[in-house]
Amino acid sequence: MAVETRARVTKGKAKGIDACADDRGIIRAAAMDQRGSLMRQIGQQGGQATPASLTEFKTAVTKALTPYASAILMDPEYGLPALRERAPGTGVLLAYEKSGYDADPENRMPDVLDHWTVRRLVEAGADAIKVLVYYDPFDDKDLTDRKDCVLERIGAECAAADVPLFVEPLAYKKGLDERGLDFAKAKPEAVKAYMAKLSEPRFRIDVLKVEVPVNMAFVQGARANTTGQVAHTKAEALRHFKEAADATTKPFIYLSAGVSDDVFRESLEWAGESGARPSGVLCGRATWLEGLPVYAKQGRTAFDAWLHEKGVRNIQMLNEVLDRVAQPWWTVYGGRAAVSA
């Protein structure tokens, strides 16, 4: 993996990333920025689909899990009250994109929150800014260029505020079901291409929050493969992990993308086996989703009990895998001394 120069990381950006990492430089972040989809799921499970319920859910997760996390990713719309319950020393990433902006399945143009700017997010307590963008590097050039322009503007905003930018690209391809076999076959090259593209200096991205490059449900020999359908052998999957990691010159962390905690841990183990070295994770639903029906049907007290038993165990097991496979975020920038604030 190529090494960036010290000039790539300003004092403020290094300080912000450090705030989101542990003392070893590993980012062990919990994700709790879901909004519309989470509210719908609470309602579907029999709970009250209200803003108050959403904030209460976020508060419960934050209070229970941040003692075991280095940072929490939150939205500024419903989640700011929850941040008051985070464990001391927990870093804060705030989401800048609108919830549900991907309703257009063709273009999926990114859109930021109407009443927020990077500076306002920092004033609200953000150590780092996170933006999600649906990205097909092989799509129509005009569409991709428009998305690039949005990311460049956000990168400039973050540079002006001297705050780190975490970008979460999600691969998609028009006409394909992202949960299906055909997309699983196309996904690795899309992930490699966007990891290379978004490493370009013009974007001023500091950390990439990326998908694992394969859908483990279609990998031969993976525990997640319960159908027998195969897009990749294990050897091919390991090669994709390593090639995607080698495609970027930025620190990268893996997102759980809604899979179970067991599937996500297996993904990280395979990444380590391949030689890919993430600098951590930003894990949300894999940690707490199984407890959502408990909250919806039985309420906060029962959910608290579930979180302190199963939720904490999930994040502890994830941390054990990270201890084996992750490298400090500053490694690709030339080491701790090169980015010391």
What are these regions (language model features)?
Residues 114-170:
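Hydrophobic alpha-helical segments and helix pairs
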Residues 71-76, 130-134, 140-143, 187-188, ...:
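Catalytic beta/alpha-barrel core
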Residues 125, 181-210, 271-281, 287:
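Structural recognition of alpha->loop->beta junctions
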Residues 7-8, 139-149, 180-192, 256-266:
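Active-site glycine- and acidic-residue-rich loops that bind
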Residues 78-83, 137-160, 215-225, 231-242, ...:
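Active-site-adjacent beta->alpha loops and helix N-cap segments on the catalytic face
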Residues 132-141, 169-184, 209-227, 251-254:
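Active-site-proximal beta-alpha loop/turn segments in soluble metabolic enzymes
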Residues 1-139, 204, 229-230, 250-251, ...:
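Alpha/beta catalytic barrel-like cores
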Residues 91-92, 161-165, 247-260:
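Short beta-strand/loop segments at the ligand-binding rim of alpha/beta enzyme cores
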